[in-house]
């Protein structure tokens, strides 16, 4: 697995490339931060995750724990989702940035696949 930082509107989004699955995984907290501009995106995600579980949403069941670089420079386990699951998550967050983010996500998610072809 390869860790990489991508940037959307000057905000970092941590990603991990899973070569076995040929899939990008995106940090859920980073995506929440980008879409909400929340002062505490980790708390926002925690509340949203609880609400989605209560509604019976499958989005949270497709959430993996992957090691990603933390602000302190250490590798820590973080919630991460594949591109298609992040797209579903984006639909549950009211944000004017949702559409531009989806376009960016499609481009970012296809990067490695294009390199392979």
Segments (PLM) and residue ranges:
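Compact nucleic-acid interaction/catalytic patches
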Residues: 33-58
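Positively charged, aromatic-accented nucleic-acid-binding surfaces
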Residues: 1-26, 33-39, 61-117
């Amino acid at each position: 697995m390869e860790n990489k930082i991508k940037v959307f509107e000057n905000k970092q989004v941590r990603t991990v490339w899973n070569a076995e699955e040929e899939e990008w995984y995106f940090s859920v907290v980073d995506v929440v931060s980008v879409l909400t501009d929340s002062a505490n995106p980790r708390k926002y995600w925690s509340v949203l995750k609880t609400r989605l579980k209560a509604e019976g949403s499958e989005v949270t069941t497709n959430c993996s724990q992957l090691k990603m670089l933390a602000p302190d420079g250490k590798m820590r386990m973080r919630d991460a989702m594949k591109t298609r699951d992040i797209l579903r998550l984006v639909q549950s967050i009211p944000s004017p940035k949702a559409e531009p983010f989806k376009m960016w996500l499609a481009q970012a998610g296809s990067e490695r696949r294009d390199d392979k072809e």
